[in-house]
Amino acid sequence: MSLMKEMLSAGVHFGHKKAFWNPQMKEYIFGINHGVHIINLEKTVPLFQDAVNFVGKTVANGGKILFVGTKRQAQDIVEAEAKRCGMPFVSHRWLGGMLTNYKTVRQSIKRLAQLEKMREDGTLESLTKKEMLQNIRTIEKLEKVLGGIKEMGGLPDAIVVIDSNKEHIAIQEAQKLGIKVVAIVDTNSNPEGIDYIIPGNDDAVKSISFYMKKFADAVIDAQGLDRAVEAKADEAAQA
């Protein structure tokens, strides 16, 4: 099946109602159907391919991709696909400063690791019941917000965002730090300042699944390529 047909099947072409449109998205709109903007997939296909290729190249060069999707219908998909390809993710709430104040975030990640170790080795059980429950609640709270980035080990090389409106703070932080931004941009969104714009439906579960599967597959393929290059380098060194 062609990429265009896959996008049609996933409903990528359905935008928002005309009343909510952002005029800056005009060049990516094909027309209107029953008051809803239809996205021009002839524009989306090459832009999406460019974005997927960029993600693959970044990973092949040893880079990290941070997937961001905190809206209800994106949460489970973003988490599952990011885990499948071994990349960090934020799927519940974007903490202000998650990128721009990463040093502080890193301290919270260390705290989470310490508490998890205490739970695993039984240290928590030696505390009073009140202290134990407080620490368990802290673990749950930190895990929910930071669980997806606790293995990130530093700032990402790029972020992939589902819904540029919802995740505008994440985008602003990435831009401030010179981190490349890949984003699904619907007809009600502002495409300005996004490095890799993907005009498309950012609400439908089918569309979100389509994007995330393609990105995760690109990461997995690139990781295989990266490992093959490393193996060749090792062989050359031993020769």
Curated annotation (Swiss-Prot):
Its source organism is: Francisella tularensis subsp. tularensis (strain WY96-3418)
Q: What is this protein called?
A: Small ribosomal subunit protein uS2
- Cystine pairs annotated here are none
InterPro entries in UniProt: Ribosomal_uS2, Ribosomal_uS2_bac/mit/plastid, Ribosomal_uS2_CS, Ribosomal_uS2_flav_dom_sf
Q: Give the UniProt entry's GO cellular component terms.
A: cytosolic small ribosomal subunit
Q: Which Gene3D superfamilies match?
A: Glucose-6-phosphate isomerase like protein, domain 1, Helix hairpin bin
Q: What gene is it encoded by? A: rpsB
Q: Which Pfam families is this protein grouped with?
A: Ribosomal_S2 (PF00318)
CDD domains linked: RPS2
SUPFAM superfamilies linked to this entry: Ribosomal protein S2
* GO MF term (any one): structural constituent of ribosome
Instruction: Give the protein family.
Output: Belongs to the universal ribosomal protein uS2 family.
Q: Which HAMAP family match?
A: Ribosomal_uS2_B (MF_00291_B)
Biological process according to GO? translation
Keyword annotations for this protein, in alphabetical order, are: Ribonucleoprotein, Ribosomal protein
